[in-house]
Amino acid sequence: MERVALFPGSFDPFTMGHKSIVDQGLTIFDRIIVGVGANSEKAGLLTPQNRVRLIEDIYKDNDAVEVRYYHGLTGDFCRELGAQFLLRGMRNTVDYEYERGM
């Protein structure tokens, strides 16, 4: 069975840290979907469409990475995609505790 992970975030902007997480995730998962989420509480630097295009350009030669815009609940988006895993980055124990609570 194909192991598909969703890497959700606002990615405004998509950083080298985000790229590192995706690249490391590709050693574990068959496919990663980068979910560019709408966050009405954040004033964005880039439009969601521009964020999607920029990330697609980074991974244009890698069929294992797909980039999709979404709004709504991340869990619903996971089910819609058939993703079995969430890929998350953690900078410290505070991030870990926050993610664990979700």
What are these regions (language model features)?
Residues 1-102:
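Nucleotidyltransferase catalytic core that binds NTPs
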